[in-house]
Structures are given as C-alpha cells and as structure tokens.
From Swiss-Prot:
Residue positions binding (R)-lipoate: K134
Primary location recorded for the protein, binned into one broad class: cytoplasm
Gene: lplA
Record function comment: Catalyzes both the ATP-dependent activation of exogenously supplied lipoate to lipoyl-AMP and the transfer of the activated lipoyl onto the lipoyl domains of lipoate-dependent enzymes.
Organism, as annotated: Shigella dysenteriae serotype 1 (strain Sd197)
Protein name per the record: Lipoate-protein ligase A
Length: 338
C-alpha cells in the first residue's frame, strides 16, 4: 500500500477547504505523506493569532462579498482569489520536514521554467530587474507527532485588490496580535504568460511523486457530497463561524470617534475573544445620559455591529426624546464596526 495520498478540492469555499485540511491533518496515519491542492474565491485568510479588525478592511470586505477565514497555522494575512493556487503538505514525524516540501514546490516551478529560491522564513522569490519578487508565501503547523506546510502560489492574482482588503481603515486601533509584513509580489503569469492552475497542480503533483518514488490516484473533494472525513460537519461549522474567524482575535482596544450636529462622541472599547470587556464614552453633548447608558450596556456584548445597534436601539424606550440622536448613533455604528 502506498504511503502517499493526493487530494484535490473542486470547491472555492475557504471554510470548506480549511475544514478539509484540518480533518485530514487530525486523522492521517503517522506514516502517511499527503498533498492537498486547492484554491479559494475572494477571501482574506488570517493567521491563527491575528486580529481581523487590525489586519483587514472588514467593511470593504463585506461590501465586496469577500470572506474572512482564520487558519490554524500562524503567520500573516493574505488575500486569495482564483488567481492563487494553494498547496498543503502533511506528514507524520520525524518524516515531516518543511525543507522537503519547499524543494518539491521549487522543483515544480523549475519544471515549468521558473527559477525561484527560498527567501527568509516562508517565501519563495524570483529575481527580476527590479529586484526579488515574492511568488509564494507559506505557513506551518506542528503537533507532537505530525506537521503541515501550506502556502500559496501567485499565478494571476488581482494584485490591485491586495491593498483594498489588507490595509485597514486609518483608525486608532492598538493591537497585541501579529501585524502582517507586506512584501513586494509578482504573478507567475509575468514570467509564464497563460500559466493555469491545472498546469501548476500537475507540476507540483509530478514533483511530489518524483521525490517519494510513488504514484497514487487523486481523490477529488467536492462540496456536492459531504467528504467522508471524521468530524467534518463539526469542523466546517467551526471554521465558518463568527466565533472562530472573529472571536478568536487576541485582546485589543478600539477607539471610534465621530462628530454629529448635537456633539462629538468617542467610544473606547476593550475587546477579548470578540466580546467587549470594557466600554467608555466621552462626549460634549448637552445630554450625555443616553450615551452613558449605552456604554453601560455593552459589558460582555459581542463586538459586532448588529449587536451594538441592538443595544443602542433598546435605549429608545428609556430615552424617547433622544430618538434622533440614538438613531444617528446606531447608523454610524453600523458602518464603523465590522
């Protein structure tokens, strides 16, 4: 029996693909070597310890229907579209070695006619007349008895959109999480016009087989049929949940400020695991009572626009004369908090 396993996803859903990856990783035999090939439609993928409110323009993402997905590995935030090819190599220890998987990807690129090299802790770069340009970034995860290396290759990604979603609004957001390092990047189509996802997958597969001296049939993973993977439904539910993607953010503080016709408002939030642990309000309004009451209601509230709006609008019962101000506050919060 072969020790290799090759899986290819035909889903573009990041939550589906990351759930598949997680399930395979948890249940694979320690003697198995796995290659999983996949890609995502418009998604910002953040590292396990990152703060989406810090890393991403979450309001722009919502408007443009871009998903947020938190992976189980560390590292920084990246934007995925169908111009990216994603790969995951898994193996039990002591077989797991990220230098092996890196060399497989480099060999695949070389077979396609691209001379690339490893740079720093997790990048692959090509040399251009303008200097080194990143074509691949990776992240890693290890447990006691196994590990995985996953990453992306930029084929024909819309690089103009990177700045749309990976540059957060210029808000006063002080975070204790990891801030992603931006790198100068380029697409493989600049070097190989017309290169396709299928060609890259085939090259990586051939390099994978060549390294281990074995071949196996590919298993196609599709959302049209629930994957036969232990605990997949539960893993997918967690991967797609707000609690995982947003609520796992490290502790941070957020300051929102706005000036209305009736006065200026500053809202200070301390947030842990997606819940407000402290809220303060500062205002020069002639009637600060409803704002003070609003801040008092927020202890333990989910840091989500709809939940804050709900608490704000609940004050209409106690402060009917301040309906205009409270509705303006609620509308502002809807746009300021995502």
């Amino acid at each position: 029996m072969s020790t290799l396993r090759l899986l290819i996803s035909d889903s573009y859903d990041p939550w589906f693909n990351l759930a598949v990856e997680e399930c395979i990783f948890r249940q694979m035999p320690a003697t198995q070597r796995v290659l999983f090939l996949w890609r995502n439609a418009d998604t910002v993928v953040i590292g396990r310890a990152q703060n989406p409110w810090k890393e991403c323009n979450t309001r722009r993402m919502e408007v443009d229907n871009v998903r947020l997905a938190r992976r189980s590995s560390g590292g920084g935030a990246v934007f995925h579209d169908l111009g990216n090819t994603c790969f995951t190599f898994m193996a039990g220890k002591p077989e797991y070695d990220k230098t092996i998987s890196t060399s497989i990807v480099l060999n695949a690129l070389n077979a396609l006619g691209v001379s690339a090299e490893a740079s720093g802790r997790n990048d692959l770069v090509v040399k251009t007349v303008e200097g080194d340009r990143k074509v691949s970034g990776s992240a890693y995860r290890e447990t006691k008895d196994r590990g995985f290396h996953h990453g992306t290759l930029l084929l024909n990604a819309d690089l103009s959109r990177l700045a749309n979603y990976l540059n957060p609004d210029k808000k006063k957001l002080a975070a204790k999480g990891i801030t992603s390092v931006r790198s100068r990047v380029t697409n493989l189509t600049e070097l190989l016009p017309g290169i396709t996802h299928e060609q890259v997958c085939e090259a990586i597969t051939k390099a994978f087989f060549a390294h281990y001296g074995e071949r196996v049939e590919a298993e196609i993973i599709s959302p049209d049929k629930t994957p036969d993977l232990p605990n997949f439904a539960e893993t997918f539910a967690r991967q797609s949940s707000w609690e995982w993607n947003f609520g796992q953010a490290p502790a941070f503080s957020h300051l929102l400020d706005e000036r209305f016709s009736w006065g200026g408002v500053e809202l200070h939030f301390d947030v842990e695991k997606g819940h407000i642990t402290r809220a303060q309000v500062f205002t020069d309004s002639l009637n600060p009572a409803p704002l003070e009451a609003f801040a008092g209601r927020l202890q333990g509230c989910l840091y989500r626009a709809d939940m804050l709006q709900q608490e704000c609008e609940a004050l209409l019962v106690d402060f009917p004369d301040q309906e205009k101000e409270l509705r303006e506050l609620s509308t502002w919060i809807a746009g300021a908090v995502r």
